[in-house]
Regions:
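Short, well-ordered beta-strand segments
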Residues: 21-23, 68, 116, 165, ...
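Short loop or secondary-structure boundary microenvironments that flank
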Residues: 26, 144, 199-202
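Alpha-helical "hinge/linker" immediately C-terminal to small N-terminal DNA-binding modules
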Residues: 1-13
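A late-sequence structural motif
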Residues: 184-226
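Hydrophobic packing within well-folded, soluble alpha/beta domains
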Residues: 40, 49-51, 157, 181, ...
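Central regulatory/effector-binding core of bacterial HTH transcription factors
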Residues: 17-80
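C-terminal regulatory
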Residues: 59-64, 74-192, 221-227
Length: 227
């Protein structure tokens, strides 16, 4: 680790300073974190933030990443994990798409529908749609007209009538208000997504990491994740 070679006491009591590297989903950061960052930097002006947007696996020690904020279920990890909250998801489609293929009211109606295929760097085939029906999660791997691996193109594909998508509600209030997207299958909720903070070790947390971890945990205690 590239920490300054000093006694443990001096290290733990050093003033928070230097570059703090955070790996986080870009839309999530823009919506929830970016508007509040001035507060953090005003309190700790000697910290410089470096935000990296990615959904790939990160070797935090090898790559010098201080903290990772992940959305979704986590694979087994040796990292320290702190749960920040859960994000509500919704199923959406464009009005023109629904006009052409019909509005699904029951899960059985999905047999005549398409989904926008979304795949991540860790999964090279589209992720099925998920619905909760009678307290049980049901998966629907619908046919696709288009497959994407970015959040912005995923939403754009739905707005251009390529199929159903499942996304966090917080990033789509405007499209819903403007009628560019419509919520469907409201009787069958989508499982929520956990939001987690990950870092390498409790014993080797730098002062700048410590204050950011405390700040981000408090931020999400005070701020609902679904607004």
């Amino acid at each position: 680790l590239s920490y300054i070679n000093e006694s443990d006491h001096d290290f733990l009591n050093a003033k928070p300073q230097g570059t703090l590297k955070i790996e986080v989903h870009g839309i999530f950061a823009a919506h929830f974190i970016m508007p509040k960052l001035h507060q953090f930097l005003s309190e700790f002006p000697q910290i410089q933030l470096q935000l990296t947007e990615s959904d790939r696996y990160v070797d935090v020690i090898k790559e010098g990443i201080d903290c990772v904020i992940r959305i979704g279920q986590l694979n087994d990890s040796d990292l320290i994990v702190r749960h920040l909250g859960d994000i509500q998801q919704v199923t959406l489609a464009s009005p023109d798409y629904l006009k052409k293929y019909g509005v699904p009211n029951k899960l059985k109606d999905l047999n005549r529908h398409f989904m926008v295929g979304f795949y991540s760097t860790a999964r090279q085939k589209p992720i099925p749609l998920e619905f909760i029906d009678k307290q049980k999660t049901e998966l629907y791997d619908l046919p696709t007209m288009i497959q994407v691996n970015g959040a912005n193109t995923y939403s754009a594909a739905a707005k251009h009538h390529f199929g159903l998508i499942q996304v966090p509600r917080y990033g789509h209030h405007l499209e819903l208000e403007q009628g560019k997207l419509c919520e469907v299958l409201t009787d069958y909720p989508v499982p929520s997504l956990p939001v987690s903070l990950l870092y390498a070790s409790k014993t080797l947390v730098s002062p700048r990491q410590k204050v950011f971890i405390e700040w981000i945990i408090q931020l999400f205690k005070e701020q609902p994740l679904n607004e």
